[in-house]
Curated annotation (Swiss-Prot):
<dbReference type="GO" id="GO:0020037">
    <property type="term" value="F:heme binding"/>
</dbReference>
<dbReference type="Pfam" id="PF00034">
    <property type="entry name" value="Cytochrom_C"/>
</dbReference>
<keyword id="KW-0053">Apoptosis</keyword>
<dbReference type="InterPro" id="IPR009056">
    <property type="entry name" value="Cyt_c-like_dom"/>
</dbReference>
<feature type="modified residue" description="N6-acetyllysine">
    <location>
        <position position="100"/>
    </location>
</feature>
<keyword id="KW-0408">Iron</keyword>
<feature type="modified residue" description="N6-acetyllysine; alternate">
    <location>
        <position position="73"/>
    </location>
</feature>
<dbReference type="InterPro" id="IPR002327">
    <property type="entry name" value="Cyt_c_1A/1B"/>
</dbReference>
<dbReference type="GO" id="GO:0046872">
    <property type="term" value="F:metal ion binding"/>
</dbReference>
<keyword id="KW-0679">Respiratory chain</keyword>
<dbReference type="GO" id="GO:0006915">
    <property type="term" value="P:apoptotic process"/>
</dbReference>
<keyword id="KW-0007">Acetylation</keyword>
<feature type="modified residue" description="N-acetylglycine">
    <location>
        <position position="2"/>
    </location>
</feature>
<feature type="binding site" description="axial binding residue">
    <location>
        <position position="19"/>
    </location>
    <ligand>
        <name>heme c</name>
    </ligand>
</feature>
<feature type="binding site" description="axial binding residue">
    <location>
        <position position="81"/>
    </location>
    <ligand>
        <name>heme c</name>
    </ligand>
</feature>
<keyword id="KW-0496">Mitochondrion</keyword>
<feature type="modified residue" description="N6-succinyllysine; alternate">
    <location>
        <position position="73"/>
    </location>
</feature>
Amino acid sequence: MGDVEKGKKIFVQKCAQCHTVEKGGKHKTGPNLHGLFGRKTGQAPGFSYTDANKNKGITWGEATLMEYLENPKKYIPGTKMIFAGIKKSAERADLIAYLKKATKE
């Protein structure tokens, strides 16, 4: 399990420009991530997803996020997420630990 505080810093630096995490948060360039864990790809209400995201058909969890966040465009070819990914697995684990906490508060 990763470090929530380190994960928050990673989120602020690499994700917050396009995503929010709080309940009722606005969609930005990317969708609000509240309720992410256990949700299928391309399903945040009110966000316009690519067909690639809608049709991927996986459920977000620690394992799927670990793989996706390493290289989003490889995991979901055709996604409009322009983020290159996080190569270090420890940093991905920290980010996932933060997301797990922040997206259900």
